A protein has these predicted regions:
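Cytochrome P450 heme-thiolate monooxygenase catalytic core
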Residues: 121-127, 131, 165-334, 350
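N-terminal mitochondrial targeting presequence
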Residues: 1-46
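Conserved cytochrome P450 K-helix/beta-meander segment immediately N-terminal to the heme-binding cysteine loop
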Residues: 416-443
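Short, small-residue alpha-helix embedded
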Residues: 329-341, 474
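C-terminal helix/juxtamembrane-tail motif
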Residues: 80, 302, 499-520
Length: 520
């Protein structure tokens, strides 16, 4: 935990003196001009075995990792290792060996070698569950041609600009209802403001949003009484993420052999996710079959079924993955965004001014407004820089490549340390400052291969456009209706629970500009 009031960089520097180097210091001198590629050299590359490493005994490394309780601070470990070994290092934990890189030019070079069917690291307990219990898989786990076939279909329905336009009338009312929910809380507290930790409310908001987009129907997650079956799904997703971390470095064949409580809880969480997703999909599937006309966009499920480009089993698998991936990830990013806005009131006022100007110029047309808030969209990128959902981005290069003058064999797991990159002054000036304007710079070198919060390329997050729209609409309505402040001034640290989460509750203060919620 960081010392109260001590900025992240200061705390890290005190703990590990020059962990974060400046340009021209330490390994910062390795940087080359954009376009050359930091890992490209005319010299004969050095062998893979010479890449700096803490040692080749994976089990000893893993023992030390566990002894230091490193699993929940792995993102800080990356920073420490880059300072110790330079801009590239390899590490073996148990049976898993990875090469870690941080330089944006190395990242750009890596992606040139990802091939037509990019491969990411499969989270072992997730994959083990699907294999052991013979669950259908979607684009999260599919490879090669089967992945590409599904992904092309999904891109049309969830990533294309025309598809995104259909989501606006589904997502906008959910954000408006969240504003109404906060007004109810204000009246309940009776102090003219609401003070509290809204983490659970954000989970409900995210699930209400993703299910509305998937099925074209509301579940009522923002009502006074929450659907208990839907709450079970949310709780299961939370448990699935939190039980994943202790299992990451355990050989999957040991899961069923020892049947630890962590594995049993993990299985139970996935069982609930599949059972509830199957139930929702089947209910809405039968409902859609009975309808012949739709006044409004009927949701992604209907469009996938109508296109007949994907088998029903594949539709269900991909819907399940998008539902599971659309709760904790989006809600956590919004919580971090509110936290950063509450600590940077001048930035919050800049964002509010942009939103209010957009409202006036667009005459209330929300679709037009969305085209007029570049700073707000940049603020989401800035939140993901400081608080990325995933601490690394992974690829298995299709062929041999050279990074930092080292030869990386094909199919080596290469991990881009995006948390460490986002906190390094070699790549971001004043890295601990919440400054969305950095993403609007005309100097593209300043942001080249740095915006990696949703991944990159054809294998980026399939729900990216939904999440971006959902968060933008949410923030528009929050900024129009409330001033957001911290209840107590102080830093909140992050812990790794497969996604980065706060180490303590974040208590926010919502001060309404009007005592009554706006009329939808």
């Amino acid at each position: 935990m960081l010392a109260r009031g001590l900025p992240l960089r200061s705390a890290l520097v005190k703990a590990c003196p020059p962990i974060l180097s400046t340009v021209g210091e330490g390994w910062g001198h390795h940087r080359v001009g954009t376009g050359e590629g930091a890992g490209i050299s005319t010299k004969t590359p050095r062998p893979y075995s010479e890449i700096p490493s803490p040692g080749d005994n994976g089990w000893l490394n893993l023992y030390q990792f566990w002894r230091e309780k490193g699993s929940q601070r792995i993102h800080f470990r990356h920073i420490e290792n880059f300072q110790k070994y330079g801009p590239i290092y390899r590490e073996k934990l148990g049976n898993l060996e990875s090469v870690y890189i941080i330089h944006p030019e190395d990242v750009a070079h890596l992606f040139k070698f990802e091939g037509s069917y990019p491969e990411r690291y499969d989270i072992p307990p997730w994959l083990a569950y699907h294999r052991y219990y013979q669950k259908p898989i979607g684009v999260l786990f599919k490879k090669s041609g089967t992945w590409k076939k599904d992904r092309v279909v999904l891109n049309t329905e969830v990533m294309a600009p025309e598809a995104i336009k259909n989501f606006i009338p589904l997502l906008n009312p959910v954000s408006q209802d969240f504003v109404s929910l906060l007004h109810k809380r204000i009246k309940q507290q009776g102090s003219g403001k609401f003070v509290g930790d809204i983490k659970e409310d954000l989970f409900h908001f995210a699930f209400e949003s993703i299910t509305n987009v998937m099925f074209g129907e509301r579940l009522g997650m923002l009502e006074e009484t929450v659907n208990p079956e839907a709450q079970k799904f949310i709780d299961a997703v939370y448990k699935m993420f939190h039980t994943s971390v202790p299992l990451l470095n355990v050989p999957p064949e040991l899961y069923r052999l020892f049947r630890t409580k962590t594995w049993r809880d993990h299985v139970a969480a996935w069982d609930t996710i599949f059972n509830k997703a199957e139930k929702y999909t089947e209910i809405f599937y039968q409902d859609l079959r009975r309808k012949t006309e739709f006044r409004n966009y009927p949701g992604i499920l209907y469009c996938l079924l109508k296109s007949e480009k994907m088998l029903l089993e594949d539709v269900k698998a991909n819907i399940t993955e998008m539902l599971a991936g659309g709760v904790d990830t989006t809600s956590m990013t919004l919580q971090w965004h509110l936290y950063e806005m509450a600590r940077s009131l001048n930035v919050q006022e800049m964002l509010r001014e942009e939103v209010l100007n957009a409202r006036r110029q667009a005459e209330g047309d929300i679709s037009k407004m969305l085209q007029m808030v570049p700073l707000l969209k940049a603020s989401i990128k800035e939140t993901l820089r400081l608080h990325p959902i995933s601490v690394t981005l992974q690829r298995y290069p299709e062929s041999d490549l050279v990074l930092q003058d080292y030869l990386i064999p094909a199919k080596t797991l290469v991990q881009v340390a995006i948390y460490a990159m986002g906190r390094d002054p070699a790549f971001f000036s004043s890295p601990d400052k919440f400054d969305p304007t950095r993403w609007l710079s005309e100097d593209k070198d300043l942001i080249h291969f740095r915006n990696l919060g949703f991944g990159w390329g054809v294998r980026q997050c399939v729900g990216r456009r939904i999440a971006e729209l959902e968060m933008t609409l949410f923030l528009i309505h929050i900024l129009e209706n409330f001033k957001v402040e911290m209840q107590h001034i102080g830093d909140v640290d992050t812990i790794f629970n497969l996604i980065l989460t706060p180490d303590k509750p974040i208590f926010l203060v919502f001060r309404p500009f009007n005592q009554d919620p706006p009329q939808a």
